[in-house]
Amino acid sequence: MKKLVTGLLALSLFLAACGQDSDQQKDSNKEKDDKAKTEQQDKKTNDSSKDKKDNKDDSKDVNKDNKDNSANDNQQQSNSNATNNDQNQTNNNQSNSGQTTNNQKSSYVAPYYGQNAAPVARQIYPFNGNKSQALQQLPNFQTALNAANNEANKFGNGHKVYNDYSIEEHNGNYKYVFSFKDPNVNGKYSIVTVDYTGQAMVTDPNYQQ
């Protein structure tokens, strides 16, 4: 009887020990599973963070490329505008140049003498040279005449009347020579020269014929 009781007790202890080992094994396996899940979750979190960082870096690169492209577009547009402005300026200059040339041609006045002109300038400075060559070097006749008249009016009577002109040549350089009659004094003239630069100068304000 004692042996039976002792056997049952030993069996109970063995089963209890086996159950405890099984529980410990389960706990150990559970801890391993939990640890593996935690590591997997941490890895996913790290991978997700890395993906977000990579996406952010990619986004920065895309934004940088967009900015670079925008800067290039702006530079190209600026260069295009500058080219168009230069072309427009060139066209305007050519147009103005053509207009000036046309105005000069249309305002050209051939040399002439005054009404009932006496041979005064022609007598003082007779010219026998190449008139066409001289006129090519000299300024516009009407412009030179106006400048000479203004200069003559600075001396004595301020309303002198144009009489005649001639051309003087010296070492290949030419000058207009104008005579202006003083309407208040019979036979009195002012002699004025205008050189190839357009500079007017009175050489004799009281020439008497």
Curated annotation (Swiss-Prot):
Residues 23-70 have a biased composition (Basic and acidic residues). Residues 17-106 are annotated as: Disordered. The keyword Transmembrane helix does not apply. Its main location: membrane. Residues 1-17 form the signal peptide. A lipid is attached at residue 18 (N-palmitoyl cysteine). PROSITE patterns: PROKAR_LIPOPROTEIN. A lipid is attached at residue 18 (S-diacylglycerol cysteine). It is a lipid-anchor. This is Uncharacterized lipoprotein SAR2457. The lineage of its organism: Bacteria, Bacillati, Bacillota, Bacilli, Bacillales.
